[in-house]
Amino acid sequence: MEEIVGLREGSPRKPVPLQELWRPCPRIRRNIQGSLEWLKERLFRVGEDWYFLVALGVLMALISYAMNFAIGRVVRAHKWLYREIGDGHLLRYLSWTVYPVALLSFSSGFSQSITPSSGGSGIPEVKTILTGVILEDYLDIKNFGAKVVGLSCTLATGSTIFLGKLGPFVHLSVMIAAYLGRVRTKTVGEPENKTKEMELLAAGAAVGVATVFAAPISGVLFSIEVMSSHFSVWDYWRGFFAATCGAFMFHLLAVFNSEQETITSIYKTSFPVDIPFDLPEIFFFVALGAICGILSCGYNYCQRTSLFFLKSNGFTSKLLATSKPLYSALAAVVLASITYPPGVGRFMASRLSMSEYLETLFDNNSWALMTKNSSPPWSAEPDPQNLWLEWCHPQMTVFGTLVFFLVMKFWMLILATTIPIPAGYFLPIFVYGAAIGRLFGEVLSLAFPEGIVAGGKVSPIMPGAYALAGAAAFSGAVTHTLSTALLAFEVSGQIVHALPVLMAVLAANAICQSYQPSFYDGTIIVKKLPYLPWIRGRKIGSHLVTVGHFMNCTLTTLAKDMPLEEVIKVVISTDVTQYPLVETTESQVLVGIVKRTHLVQSLHTDSASWAPGQQPCLQDILANGCPTQPVTLQLSTETSLHETHNLFELLNLQLLFVTSRGRAVGSVSWVELKKAISTLTNPPAPK
């Protein structure tokens, strides 16, 4: 012992290896190490989660603001080039189209060359990961870099391609959360904990939404509604704390950079507070919600059908498999050509950015009444003080411009969602819903130019309020969420229309959820990601179907008295990840679970220790240290399909064994559950 420690016998200090003493400045190094250990002990006394959640929120706010800053500079450069290039139509057309074509081609090629999983929104994959499914490479740091660069190029195209950043930013936030989780595990020195990892990933999803819209409350609620069917209340404080840190930091950076005078909402509105709406208007808001619900059904169906067509069509599937940048360039040419301002783009306010779309649509003045007796000229450049004039063209009324915008953007947005680039799809549908509400409000303002009279008081029609309700209702119906109502309040700074907006969102969701899966669930279906379909309502009879009707009866068990040769045959002939352990071959009483990896490792380790002629059995392998797991949860043959589905969703399970009077008789996995639910919802035709 004296040759491996550097202290004399009886020394009061801790033993130190001689290797440490041979290094330079051993005493200083020990003092620094002791000070760091003391600081770590004091800091982590209140809980180490606080520090990592603060780091998560601050980091994502910095990344979000830096991206916005860089993208804003690039977009302004594009506008300057288009403005200064002259009056030649060919040069102006090329400056308008070549710019987004080059950016989208680079975004697609760069992100796909690094990792194919960086394309798309990322929310469907994150939703799958939070259910307990392991998706390789989706949370790697190289995916993070590809997503950041690709998303920046996508957003730099402006409103020409009409895409956002919410989905990819949620994916980026979850990647950072996963990385911080690994750092936390090494710092604290505790073993990996799957539960804590999922808690941090859930907080990361909330931070992603909060740092895009600077809306912490709706960010947490939206991430809960989109990402999970069951959510632990224990995770609430993590999500709210990290989201608040991120949103506050985002606002703080805007103030420090003189973009805002103080902390305010992103899209400022000025609705009157005295009488914001009257009771008869509730009916109109509900009707608007119903219209948004019907249109959202059509949008989700067309978008999902388009993705199916691209995958099944021979030409497009080959093009997407071999030349993704070429497909992106072709789609960008189509979209940029249509939005070219001197062309048909002048009838859809194509010179406005995504934020300017919302600022103008939320205007509380009625454009129809303001232009009723006059037709304002179409200026050569947008007027920053009167951006709403972009929606008014001498050759078309306000109603014609809004209708043309809705018709064209419907299929253009579907086309944009098929481009294999990192992009978000929530902000475009939010803007689209605002345009629906604006059109509805303008019609009402024309029908009731003096306002609605009720109880002797006059309540004027504010189209901006209907635009706010339409944005929340349409986006909520497309994503099957209710928190979009709160998101609309947070980004606009208005809550005077809380009741009518919420009723519109409820009406839209009631229609869309009855007939179509959500946008993200539809993408999961198209990409064939692992998922559990919802059991909607009691009419399908899920409470009457028991596990015995749909379980997998082919079950390979390992008995404790099974000879070693048979154990090896079972391992070689099967590829399952775990085996049910039974007491004896005859009784088949389930007593535990053996992981395949542990069993194979024990077989390799113990095979050399057996004497010639000895006939070992599985019990000997287990006695020599092969770990087993207790059966903490099992199903009965009489358990209903509804209860089984709830267990799998609540506990993020992948497989459960079925017993009858203690005997192992089968197993249930996602495959059996999905097949049983599909049989109930779409019963086979009678023979």
Curated annotation (Swiss-Prot):
Domain of life: Eukaryota
Spans traversing the lipid bilayer: 51-82, 91-111, 141-160, 161-180, 236-255, 282-310, 325-342, 400-420, 421-440, 500-520
Family annotation (PROSITE patterns): CBS
InterPro entries: CBS_dom (IPR000644), CBS_dom_sf (IPR046342), Cl-channel_core (IPR014743), Cl_channel-K (IPR002250), Cl_channel_volt-gated (IPR050970), ClC (IPR001807)
PTM section of the record: N-glycosylated.
Positions annotated with a glycan in the UniProt record: N193
Family according to the record: Belongs to the chloride channel (TC 2.A.49) family. CLCNKB subfamily.
Protein name listed in UniProt: Chloride channel protein ClC-Kb
Organism of origin: Rattus norvegicus
Gene assigned in the entry: Clcnkb
